[in-house]
C-alpha cells in the first residue's frame, strides 16, 4: 500500500491534488471492526489520503459506550445509507470520497475504491481561510441539490482504549484520526461565500481541522482544505 502513496497525491500531470477522503464508520463495541481500524491506521500515514474515523453510537446498547461516539456521526452514516440506497447500516463501513462504499475492510477492495477516486477527483472550488476565523468558498459548478460545508476536527494521534464490557471486553482498541467534532457550517450554491468558523475550545488542543465541501445529503466530496 505504501508504494502507491506518492503516486496517489499527484494528478496525471504530476501536480498535487486534493486528498481522497476515506471515512470509516466503526465502534469500540463492534467485534468485527479490528481489521478496519488497522487499515485506517495505515492509511493515516499515506500521502494523498485523508483518513477519518467516525465512531457510531448505535452499538452502545451491547454494554459498552464508545468513548468517541456521537449521534451526529451515526447521522452522517445514515445519510450515506439513504444516498446510496443501501439496505441498512453496518460496521465497519468505509466510504471513499462520498462516492462509493465497502462494508468490511478488505484491503484490495478499499485500495480499488481509492484508486478510482484518485482518477476521478477534481480540485473543485477553491477553499481558503481568512484570519483563521472565516472560510471562503470560491465560485464553481453547483451540484444538483446544492452542497454543504462541513468542519471536521480530528485527533491525529493514535488512541488506545481498553474495552471493559460487551463483545470486545478485555481488548484494547487502537484508533487513528478519530473525529471529535463535526459541524455543518452552511450550504453552498455555486457562488463565492464566506462562513464563520467556530472558535477553538479547550477540547480542541492537539486536534487537526479539515473542511469538506460536499454535495448535499451525503453526496460526493467536491473540495478539501486541511490545516
Enumerate the predicted regions with their spans.
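Boundary at the C-terminal end of the N-terminal hydrophobic targeting segment
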Residues: 2-9
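Solvent-exposed loop/turn segments at secondary-structure junctions
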Residues: 27-31, 56-61, 100-103
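Thiol-based oxidoreductase modules, predominantly thioredoxin-like and allied folds used
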Residues: 48-74, 88
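Short, conserved sequence motifs used for protein processing/export or organelle targeting and
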Residues: 67-87, 100-227
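Ligand-binding face of N-terminal immunoglobulin V-set domains in extracellular IgSF glycoproteins
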Residues: 94
Amino acid at each position: 500500500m505504501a508504494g502507491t502513496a506518492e503516486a496517489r497525491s499527484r494528478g496525471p500531470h504530476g501536480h498535487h491534488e486534493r486528498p481522497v477522503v476515506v471515512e470509516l464508520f466503526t465502534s469500540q463495541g463492534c467485534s468485527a471492526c479490528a481489521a478496519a481500524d488497522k487499515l485506517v491506521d495505515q492509511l493515516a500515514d499515506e500521502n494523498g489520503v485523508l483518513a477519518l474515523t467516525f465512531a457510531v453510537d448505535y452499538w452502545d446498547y451491547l454494554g459498552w459506550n464508545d468513548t468517541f461516539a456521537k449521534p451526529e456521526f451515526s447521522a452522517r452514516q445514515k445519510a450515506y445509507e439513504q444516498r446510496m440506497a443501501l439496505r441498512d447500516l453496518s460496521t465497519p463501513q468505509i466510504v471513499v470520497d462520498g462516492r462509493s462504499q465497502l462494508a468490511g475492510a478488505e484491503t484490495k477492495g478499499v485500495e480499488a475504491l481509492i484508486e478510482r477516486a484518485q482518477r476521478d477527483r477534481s480540485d473543485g472550488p477553491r477553499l481558503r481561510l481568512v484570519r483563521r476565523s472565516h472560510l471562503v468558498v470560491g465560485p464553481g459548478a453547483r451540484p444538483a441539490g446544492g452542497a454543504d460545508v462541513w468542519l471536521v476536527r480530528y485527533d491525529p494521534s493514535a488512541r488506545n482504549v481498553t474495552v471493559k464490557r460487551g463483545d470486545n471486553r478485555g481488548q484494547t482498541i487502537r484508533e487513528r484520526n478519530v473525529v471529535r467534532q463535526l459541524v455543518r457550517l452552511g450550504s453552498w450554491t455555486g457562488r463565492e461565500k464566506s462562513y464563520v468558523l467556530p472558535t477553538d475550545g479547550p477540547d480542541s488542543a492537539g486536534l487537526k481541522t479539515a473542511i469538506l465541501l460536499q454535495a448535499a445529503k451525503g453526496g460526493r466530496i467536491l473540495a478539501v482544505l486541511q490545516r
